[in-house]
A protein has these predicted regions:
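Short hydrophobic-aromatic micro-motifs
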Residues: 54-55, 108-111, 141-143, 158-161, ...
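Conserved hydrophobic/aromatic beta-strand scaffold that supports enzyme active sites
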Residues: 100, 110, 177-179
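Anionic-ligand binding region
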Residues: 122-150, 155-160
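Acidic, His/Gly-rich catalytic cores of divalent-metal-dependent hydrolytic chemistry
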Residues: 152-220
C-alpha cells in the first residue's frame, strides 16, 4: 500500500512521487490535497482518477468551509487560490471526504492530525511523539498534518506519517511518501527529488506569496 499526505496543490511533486513509487495494490492519502501551491485542481483530479481513499485535511476543510482552524496569511492565500481554481465537481469531492476512514478490512486507519481530534485539526502528532497509545483496534495508523516524515513499529502495530508530498518541513526538501506491507507488517519511508524551481516560478505566476516557493528549497 502506498501512503501519501499533505500534497498541498504541488502537482510537480505529486507526479515525481507517483513515478518513483514501486507497484502497490492501493494508494491512500492522509489529507490536505490542496492549499499553498498552484495546482489544487490537478491534484484533486489525480486522486479522483485513481480512486484514492482520502481523508479531509484542515486546508481541504477550509476550502469547503468546514473547519474552525485558524490560518496565517500565507496559508489563507493558498486556500483562497484553491477556492477560485476548483470546479464545482472538485469542490464536491473535497466536501465529501471523511475525517477518518478504514481500509483493508479495518486494519489501516487514516486521519489527518490526531485520532482523538480528527475533525478540528488542533492537535499535531510529531514522529517523536508516536506511541502505542495512539493505536486503537487498527494494525496501522496513518496520519499527516505535521509535514514531518516518520514511522514507528510497536507490538500493537505501526504509526506512520508518510511525510509531505508538496511542502516538507523536516529539513529535507524532497517529496515524501511511504510504502506499507501489511502481510509483513513493515513500512518503508521514501524521498524523491522534484523540480522545485518550476514550482517556485509557478507560485509567482499565480500571484501567490513568494515565500510559499522559497521555503520549498529549504524543506521548511
Amino acid at each position: 500500500m502506498g501512503l501519501v499526505s499533505d500534497i498541498h496543490g504541488n502537482r510537480v511533486a505529486l507526479e515525481a512521487v507517483l513515478a518513483d513509487m514501486p507497484p502497490v495494490d492501493e494508494l491512500c492519502c492522509a489529507g490536505d490535497v490542496v492549499g499553498y501551491n498552484p495546482w489544487p485542481g490537478e491534484c484533486v483530479d489525480e486522486l479522483r482518477a485513481r480512486d484514492v481513499p482520502t481523508v479531509m485535511g484542515n486546508h481541504d476543510a477550509a476550502v469547503v468551509g468546514e473547519t474552525p482552524f485558524r490560518f496565517n496569511g500565507m496559508a489563507k492565500a493558498g486556500i483562497d487560490h484553491a477556492d477560485r481554481r476548483l470546479s464545482e465537481a472538485q469542490l464536491e469531492w473535497l466536501a465529501g471526504l471523511p475525517t477518518e476512514r478504514r481500509e483493508c478490512d479495518g486494519r489501516v486507519k487514516l486521519v489527518h492530525g490526531h485520532p482523538d481530534d480528527p475533525d478540528r485539526y488542533t492537535r499535531y502528532t510529531y514522529p517523536e511523539e508516536f506511541s502505542p497509545r495512539l493505536l486503537g483496534d487498527e494494525d496501522v495508523l496513518v496520519l499527516g498534518h505535521t509535514h514531518k516524515q516518520g514511522a514507528r513499529q510497536f507490538a500493537a502495530g505501526i504509526v506512520v506519517n508518510p511525510g509531505s508530498v508538496g511542502q516538507p518541513r523536516d529539513g529535507d526538501p524532497r517529496a515524501g511518501y511511504a510504502v506499507l506491507d501489511l502481510d509483513a507488517m513493515t513500512v518503508d519511508t521514501h524521498r524523491v527529488e522534484y523540480d522545485i524551481d518550476a514550482v517556485q516560478a509557478a507560485v509567482e505566476d499565480a500571484g501567490l506569496p513568494k515565500r510559499i516557493g522559497t521555503r520549498l528549497a529549504r524543506g521548511q
